[in-house]
Amino acid sequence: MIIVTFFWVGIVLSAIWTFYKVVLYPYRVSPLRTLPQSQRGHWLWNHAFSEFLQPIGQLHAELLLQIPNDGMICLRGLFGAPKIFLTSPKSLADVLVHRADDFEKLPGERKILRAVVGDGLVTAEGDVHYQQKRKLLAGFTPPKIRALYPVFWKEATALTQQIRRTLTHDGSGIYTGTTDMVYWAPRVSMDMIGAAGFGQSFHSLRDADSEIIHCYEKAFAIGAGHLLCVFADTLLPRIILQWLPWPRWRQFRQNIDSIRDFCHQWVTDAKATTALGDGIPNNLLANMIHTGEYTFQELIEQVRTFLAAGHENTSSVVMWVMLALASDSQLQSRLRQELQANLPEVELDEVDLAILEQLPLLNAVVSEAIRLFPPLPIGNRIAIRDTTVMNHPIPKGTPFLIVPRAINRSSELWGPDADRFNADRWINPDTGRFNNHGGASSNYSFLSFFHGPHNCIGQNFARAELRTVVAAVIRSFDMVLDNPAADVSPVGWFTPRPADGVKVKLRSLV
């Protein structure tokens, strides 16, 4: 009888606690209850899975337009759990800069990233992150980046040469044909990060069967089934997964392990080269080894991180910028004129390629592509202690959504043409010079590289890569879309790409 009584008391207390946590606290007690709320969620799970809806970030861009707010919108998840969508420069500045120590990436997100891209700078938090970034910054100074332009240009030129080999020669010196830039973008970005990052020649452009490219294509595949593999690999014990009849997971795991093996070999090679004492090679890995501050395993994890970030992110933007240029013949012509005037064909090897940083339209095109198509369209943070955002109390454990795709396309921040590719927004009409704000009133309107202590350490590296690829391709070919009606909606869980690819008709120029 006593056991039965305790049982029913437990049931009643559990029901009361559940009612308080699910119904009473979120909507009647929580300090977040006064924030603007979205009513568009699913009847059962509300917005719990909003960050996975394709195109990623599009829903949040719509909510930003539809819900009046002062910088924060409260989205509800399972059982009414709050998730705060940051919508203004002021709220973003608080979370990313002013109170950055009060926020971290979600533990689950860090665990997934650690499994996929390594336990390096991207997954580090707190003092560990500070120390890692302090040591790495020396390899990303402007002089270091400028010294890499010849490396980038060599790979960008190799791209144009390999594309030309796939075209048809008409007998008059002109090559024409059709190609898909979605095929070439990951290959040129892989060869660039290989050479400039690790001193390795991957030859991904020349080798259609490049093993490292195939590993990455499969490890970062598009589709819900692949995403399930990532979650399972992160959340379930390996011993359980090994017993399951799940070939897709085994293939995913094999690709991740192969990438780690590649990184292990590159670090081994780089340490052997450095030990010869013939000077420090001009690449990121050699610089890290030269400091003497990294263990062998730490080097492997940082290489995994830079390989993923330097390859996937750049590859994504290359696809989108080629799509934008192929869609606008006038912009393409203007850019070509600028390049021809500043990069003469004769004795190009003797030109200081850092001049690319001074070309207004080239930099405008690159910045606009990064703005409109951020390689990381959405991110998460969680409050690790009670804090405030815009003077509003935030309880410990509150998750936040940071959505570059939505902020970068906000008409309130970027004007009525925020959704349109407009490179001229980055050029001052009175002087014709490049500006670094694109007409936005706050630098927090541009979120592609985030801000604060956790901003992207490789943003100038990525811009240099993009300048050289765009310059090399536009100097070499005239491009038009093969099918202007193709579906160019962004798809993908990690770095979005056009759904139907970027198929272009090419005509050689040089």
UniProtKB/Swiss-Prot annotation:
Transmembrane segments: 2-22
Localization in the cell: Membrane
Superkingdom of source: Eukaryota
GO annotation terms (biological process): mycotoxin biosynthetic process
Pathway per the UniProt entry: Secondary metabolite biosynthesis
GO CC, alphabetical: membrane
MF (Gene Ontology): heme binding; iron ion binding; monooxygenase activity; oxidoreductase activity, acting on paired donors, with incorporation or reduction of molecular oxygen
Residue numbers binding heme: 456
CDD domains, per database record: CYP_FUM15-like (cd11069)
Listed cofactors: heme
EC class: oxidoreductase
Sites where a glycan is attached: 313, 408, 443
Described purpose of this protein according to its UniProt entry: Cytochrome P450 monooxygenase; part of the gene cluster that mediates the biosynthesis of the indole diterpenes penitrems. The geranylgeranyl diphosphate (GGPP) synthase ptmG catalyzes the first step in penitrem biosynthesis via conversion of farnesyl pyrophosphate and isopentyl pyrophosphate into geranylgeranyl pyrophosphate (GGPP). Condensation of indole-3-glycerol phosphate with GGPP by the prenyl transferase ptmC then forms 3-geranylgeranylindole (3-GGI).
Family per record: Belongs to the cytochrome P450 family.
Name of this chain's protein: Cytochrome P450 monooxygenase ptmK
Species assigned in the record: Penicillium ochrochloron
Taxon lineage: Eukaryota, Fungi, Dikarya, Ascomycota, Pezizomycotina
Primary gene name: ptmK
